[in-house]
C-alpha cells in the first residue's frame, strides 16, 4: 500500500512505461488491487507522444522503468503549453542506475515505495484486503491507448471480465495447460501482451 501512503486512491490512473520487467507487472497488479487503473505506455515513445496520454488519462502517478523514462516524464512535468502535464505529481522508478543525484519532488524509487507500503500496512492492516474485496468484474482493468495513426490516440477501457474471457479463449485456442510457460516479450502497452501477462 505504498501507493496509498502517497495519496493514490481508488479510481485513479497510474501510467506505466518501460520494457517488460517484473516490477512493472507487479505495479499493474498493485494498481488494480487498490482499485486503480494502469495505463501502460510504449517505452520507445518520445516525451511529446506521452503528453497526450498522460493528460487525457488524467495521470497523477507514473511508474518508470529507468532514467530514460524518468527524464521524459520530468520533461513533461516541467513543460509549459501544449506539452505540459502539471498533474503528474508522483514518479516512481524501478532501476536506480543513474538516479543517485535526482532530487525532484514526488520522485521515489520502487524500493522506497515498498518500504512506505510496509509501514502503511502496519498502520492499516485490513486496507489492502478490503480494497481487493470491493473489486468487481465490470471495473476497468486497464486503459490501453491506440497508436493514433488516424488521429489522436484513443483510450480503450477494458474490464476485468473482458480480460478474463479473452484469456480463457486464448488458453483454449493455444491449448495451454497448467504448468505451461508463456514468454512475455511484447510491449506491456499492447493488448496481446497485457492479455497473456
Where are these regions (language model features)?
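Conserved structural elements of the adenylate-forming
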Residues: 1, 156-177, 195
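Conserved AMP-binding/adenylate-forming
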Residues: 2-47
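Structural core segment of the AMP-binding/adenylate-forming
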Residues: 5-6, 34-116
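Conserved phosphate-binding and hydrolysis motifs of nucleotide-dependent enzymes
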Residues: 7, 11, 147-155, 159-160
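Conserved S/T- and glycine-rich ATP-binding loop of Class I adenylate-forming
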Residues: 14, 31, 62, 140, ...
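AMP-binding (ANL) adenylation modules
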Residues: 19-21, 186-190
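Conserved pre-ATP/AMP-binding loop-to-beta segment of ANL
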Residues: 107-145, 152, 175-181
